[in-house]
Amino acid sequence: MTRREMKILVEVSHTSGHDVRTGIQAVVRGLLSGLRLARMNFQTVRWSRWRNAFVPLDRYRNQALGISDLSERDRCPNEIDRVWLLLPEVIYGPKLLRMIAYARQQRMRIAAIFHDAIPVTHPELVRREARKFHSAYMTALGDVDLIVAVSDSAAEQFRLYHEKRLGRVPTIYVCPSSGELAGEERAAAKPNAIPDTVNILCVSTLEPRKNHQTLLQAFELASSVVSHPKLYLHLVGDRYKDADHIVELVLAATRRNPNIAWYGKITDHRLIRLYRESDFTIYPSTIEGFGLAISQSLWNRRPCICANYGAMAEIAKDGGCLTVDVGDAAKLSDAIVALATSLDLRQKLAKEIDNRPLKTWQVYATEICRQFEAVD
């Protein structure tokens, strides 16, 4: 099947209506950028409760998603033999069932990007809404034609969930996300010189599983044993619902130590500046479906400290990362000290980054569309 014979409807109600910067929203924006660059026939849509149907996004919402330059040819191809509905967001409540039912009535194929099963496997780490609705969300996805899992770990969690409860498992295709910041130039490698200061960047929403408490403890330990170079920790990430205690924890740390800064939610343009200024990154999350911040760090040629297990280890295995037990503050501190004080180690990891394959969002989108054709 050629591209002209297939049209993709991408349901992006949440991302198009909210100025949020979570990993899922980054994937949505990157996916749309990739579809546009690959010149796929696609249209962004949202679900209308009043019409009980999908409606195209207006120019304002498309502009907010960075795809306002879609041509009419891209949006409205003349001849379509097959329509795919692509669900890249997590959708809670009865709306998802209505979407799937409508798509079936219209004889559409349905694909969903599956990010993680964390609210089911670790309900204590997520907000109340996710604890309440994520299981029903995963159950509903059992009726789609194709699951695009962000990692082998996410694919296995989805498979186990459906084998235990329903018996039937849709086709699952693993397609890790890109770390590219769409529209932003990739950061250059750091100069090979011993700096007087080392800037450490952590990009992560302030939620329980991201493990900020251990990170702050580890940074204090590392700072106490390293007098030169001077260590600075830069935290980027929005607040998380039902986790105000983590915000207070971070704010208290910034008051105690002027070398710790929290920037909250920022634009991609400012984020790329922080990547350029950083010497390495740290992603202390204890559990992930994928770990987009690790991939972003590698894309921007910055070594990353991350967990030595799960989805994080999947990304790290091809090089550029220093893996460690992120639940142990002493071991995490040792990793910080090692990267901060050893230019040779940072250069070794930087070379591994340049030698490993890194996909763009265009490659990511093309890979998914090829899988649509394979399923058809």
Model-based region annotation:
Residues 1-376:
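Carbohydrate transferase catalytic cores enriched for Leloir-type hexosyltransferases
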